[in-house]
Design a protein with these regions (language model features):
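Bacterial N-terminal signal peptides
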Residues: 20-31
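Glycine-aromatic micro-motifs
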Residues: 32-191
């Protein structure tokens, strides 16, 4: 066999080894081949109140990954739960034909979402986690979990501290400008 063919064949073998090595590294990086029990199950969460704020949420759900902005048609945000900790009303969603709730979608591990249930008083029956169809900014519909008050009361004046967190989240994710303006007007009452 001519020397040129031998060198060409050795070069091809090296390329094949490099490609296989690269594929193996990529497969390991994305978790290919791991037992399914080791892979974290993710929950798609729609945050519309204080849960719009990524910095606020990250305190409780470090796995949080922002997906995109989204909206929930035919509902509106109302402050239907009084919070002693916040000193005023905190949000829930109430059905309203033609209404719109603006928020964000995050992926959160199931384990952290279950822990968030405790923070949101789900075991006490104050809030409940439900799955809704929300419209992503990409024009597609998604099933996402959200929290809403089980037995709405009030409405109450929104808590100043709570509005600050909502405004922070809405600003952080460039949520609908008219909604942000409305939140800022509510907040201005405290200045």
């Amino acid at each position: 066999m001519p020397l040129a063919q031998i060198k060409e064949r050795e070069g091809m073998k090296r390329k094949i080894i490099l490609i296989k090595s690269f594929c193996l590294i990529v497969a390991m990086a994305i978790g290919f081949g791991q037992p399914s029990a080791e892979k974290e199950e993710l929950v798609l969460h729609f945050g519309y109140g204080s849960n719009m704020s990524e910095s606020y949420m990250r305190q409780y759900t470090p796995s949080l990954k922002y997906v995109m902005n989204a909206q929930l048609p035919n509902f509106e945000i109302q402050f239907r739960k009084y919070s002693n900790n916040m000193g005023g009303g905190i949000s829930s969603i109430i059905e309203k034909p033609g209404g719109m709730v603006y928020g964000v979608m995050y992926y959160i591990t199931k384990k952290e979402m279950d822990e968030l249930d405790i923070l949101e008083d789900v075991p006490l029956g104050i809030y409940k986690r439900e799955t809704f169809q929300v419209l992503g900014e990409d024009g597609k519909w998604y099933e996402a979990d959200l929290y809403r008050v089980t037995e709405p009361k009030g409405p109450y004046e929104p808590a100043k501290k709570y509005l600050d967190i909502m405004i922070s989240g809405a600003t952080e994710h460039n949520i609908n400008k008219n909604w942000l303006k409305k939140l800022k007007l509510m907040r201005a009452k405290y200045d």
